[in-house]
Amino acid sequence: ALPISPDLTKEQRNGIIEGARAICSKVNYTGAGTVEFIVSEDGTISFLEVNTRVQVEHPVTEAVTGVDIIAEQLRIAAGEPISFTEDPHSTGHAFEFRINAEDILNGFAPCPGTIVSFEPPTGPGIRVDSAVRSGSIIPPYYDSLIAKLIVWGPTRDVALRRAKHALREFRIDGV
């Protein structure tokens, strides 16, 4: 799955927001979490699941809302109120690409080793979340995720152009 912020109608977006609110209200949930819905090709929205933790895809939501979800989660855990009082508005379109150390010619098997060179892309609407750098070792024991590339644009087309450019610019050698 490619985490994206889909183009939704106002009615679809409001339905998702109200559905998520109703679920959280019913169980008196306070904190950061994820209420997931799936949108079919015909526009039908279906509830998928609830997670009482932040998902790996949270930067997509951060990109389109401007809300630092992790900072808000820490505020709530510290007993502080969230930093905003109105619902965040979604703007633009965002994609998240998971950059993994995998062997595409061997069924995407993990590809451990030492990262010789790590050169992430930069530019408007480009965010890279990673804890590796040149010289980092990717062990065979854990998830092969190296980085998450999050790309935002004011429109889907701009976001796609930026994503294509960023993926061409991303350089990782050694694994």
Where are these regions (language model features)?
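ATP-dependent carboxylate activation and anion-phosphoryl transfer catalytic cores
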Residues: A1-V175
